[in-house]
């Protein structure tokens, strides 16, 4: 029995550019075979739609991979119900891992503007995929040098040594090691890997600034998650994911055991107090 949203997802996938579509079909078929329900709710986007998203803060740039048929947006599902807070659930992680193995880049790995629903197929760079010519014999994603990519050598090394291999942490490490404007290129990753292996000392990254008193009301500057506890772990990430510009009423403050401030929202869930991510209004 096919999942509730399979036909809708397939129809959207079929709008994609040739090689992106081939990879997305493999991903969708794999998820069906493994009992992982998703809704691929958007693929192709018009310039007018993208402009509206930029104006609303939902998107950061007009240079969207949706415009060239190389991106899709998804949400985890169970029957008719979609779950915007399940991107880092067990099934969500498996789906994202499979997508990455097929050559997709996940917006949830990005620093600053985190975009959990977003998967983009870089192929040979922005706008390099085709329409109506069929997938190439080797349709793996081959990002250009300026594309935000992961080097398996670097990530594997960090994971093996129990280091945080997220893009955000790699960017912090790169800055502390003197690697400017880190974007995850192969050259930058190779340099960072060499410095990590050499164990060269580095200066700590700049300290984060937090609200320490109740700001009463804040607006999110980036996509933010809500947690049922001051401990921001995947297990506690049950309050949903909210886009930039979302306004929250703050009823109180909390702190982790390590002393990191948290904002307690009116709903009872906790939100980051980091001034890089939320702003008092």
From Swiss-Prot:
Natural source organism: Listeria phage A118
Disulfide bonds: none
GO biological-process terms attached to the record: cell wall organization
Keyword 4Fe-4S belongs to the record: no
GO MF terms, alphabetically ordered: peptidase activity
Domain of life of the native organism: Viruses
E.C. designation(s): 3.4.24.-
UniProt-recorded name of the protein: L-alanyl-D-glutamate peptidase
Role of this protein: Cell wall lytic enzyme. Hydrolyzes the link between L-alanine and D-glutamate residues in certain bacterial cell-wall glycopeptides.
Record keywords, A-Z: Cell wall biogenesis/degradation, Hydrolase, Secreted
């Amino acid at each position: 029995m096919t999942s509730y949203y399979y036909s809708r997802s397939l129809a959207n996938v079929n709008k994609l550019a040739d090689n992106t579509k081939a990879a997305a079909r493999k991903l969708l078929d794999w998820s069906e075979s493994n009992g992982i329900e998703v809704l691929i709710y958007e693929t192709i986007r018009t310039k007018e739609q993208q402009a509206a998203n930029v104006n609303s803060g939902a998107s950061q740039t007009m240079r969207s991979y949706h415009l060239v048929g190389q991106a899709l947006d998804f949400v985890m599902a169970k029957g008719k119900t979609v779950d915007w807070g399940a991107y880092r659930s067990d099934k969500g992680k498996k789906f994202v891992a499979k997508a990455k193995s097929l050559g997709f880049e996940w917006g949830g790995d990005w620093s600053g503007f985190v975009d959990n629903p977003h998967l983009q197929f870089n192929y040979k760079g922005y706008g390099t995929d085709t329409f109506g010519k069929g997938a190439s014999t080797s349709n793996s994603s081959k990002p250009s040098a300026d594309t935000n990519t992961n080097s398996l050598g670097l990530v594997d090394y960090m994971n093996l040594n129990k280091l945080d291999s997220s893009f955000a942490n790699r960017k912090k490490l790169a800055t502390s090691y003197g690697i400017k404007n880190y974007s995850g290129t192969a050259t930058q990753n190779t340099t960072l890997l060499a410095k990590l292996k050499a164990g060269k000392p580095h200066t700590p990254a700049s300290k984060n600034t937090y609200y320490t008193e109740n700001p009463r009301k804040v607006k999110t500057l980036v996509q933010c998650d809500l947690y049922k506890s001051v401990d921001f772990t995947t297990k506690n990430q049950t309050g949903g994911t909210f886009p930039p510009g979302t306004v929250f009423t703050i009823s109180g403050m909390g702190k982790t055991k390590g002393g990191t401030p948290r904002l307690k929202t009116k709903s009872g869930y906790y939100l980051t107090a980091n001034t890089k991510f939320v702003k008092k209004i």
